Regions:
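N-terminal extracellular/periplasmic Venus flytrap/periplasmic-binding protein-like
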Residues: 11-12, 23-32, 43, 173-234
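Active-site-proximal alpha-helical scaffold in enzymes
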Residues: 86-118, 164-193
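Flexible glycine-/small-residue-enriched beta->alpha junction loops
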Residues: 111-163
């Protein structure tokens, strides 16, 4: 089998729920990341060709049945680049990378692009239809399930609680981890460690706001304190 090399990697800045990137769907953001990667590596200008794209996501794009295909069509890549979509919940993006590596290892591809995209700001709900004839029953959101039985129907938040209980991880330890994570992220941002990996996203101007170039992580809370964390509900 052939060896696989990761040549480069980029991303957009992390947004927050209902924040600056709320108008962009996951395919919009993923296409911008792909174009940024192509510009950074100058792959196409050097005569290179991307064989395929593996894209992962825990949520599905509300505007497409084939988000990986739509992403490629929105990018600089051509129609002849095949795509595949991977859904493995929180492991979707890393699984997409594994699939891309496997394709290169076995010789079905030479150059692949792989990664993940998500937009919680554009998360949609599925609604039920009227199921009782002759009754006007308003559509209701259908709860999304991850398991066929209640004990399997748990998301990552519930899983984290279960693991904390299983291994005796205390609330104090969780707060310390969260605090250190925020401080390290803020310090890394201030020192410019993420600058080369973040692809700017241009947010168009409106009647009330000017054009904005979004090129940093929005979720950071550098003013986080241990006292503030300890006051949050468990």
């Amino acid at each position: 089998m052939r060896n696989v090399v990761i040549v480069d990697g980029v991303r957009t800045g992390f947004g927050k729920l209902g924040g600056s990137l709320r108008q962009f769907g996951m395919t919009d953001l993923a296409a911008r990341a792909i174009d940024g990667l192509l510009d950074k590596t100058q792959l196409l200008e050097r005569g290179g060709k991307v064989d395929g794209v593996y894209m992962g996501s825990a949520l599905h794009d509300h505007g497409s049945h084939a988000p990986s295909r739509l992403t490629v069509l929105k990018s600089k890549l051509g129609y002849d680049v095949w795509t595949s979509y991977v859904e493995r919940q929180c492991g979707s993006a890393i699984d997409a990378i594994n699939h891309a590596a496997a394709a290169i290892m076995i010789g079905t591809a030479d150059i692949m692009i792989a990664g993940g995209a998500e937009s919680y700001s554009q998360l949609y709900s599925k609604f039920s239809m009227c199921v009782e004839p002759y009754k006007l029953i308003p559509p209701m959101p259908i709860p999304q399930k991850l398991g066929a039985v209640p004990e399997d129907n748990c998301d990552m938040i519930t899983t984290a609680e279960n693991i904390a209980q299983m291994y005796g991880i205390t609330r104090q330890e969780c707060d310390e981890f969260a605090y250190n994570s925020q401080m390290r992220a803020a310090a890394a941002t201030e020192k410019g460690y993420f600058k080369d990996e973040i692809i700017p996203v241009v947010i168009p101007a409106t009647k009330k706001t000017p054009e904005i170039v979004f090129a940093s992580d929005e979720f950071l809370r550098p003013t986080t304190t241990m006292e503030g964390l300890s006051a949050l509900k468990s």
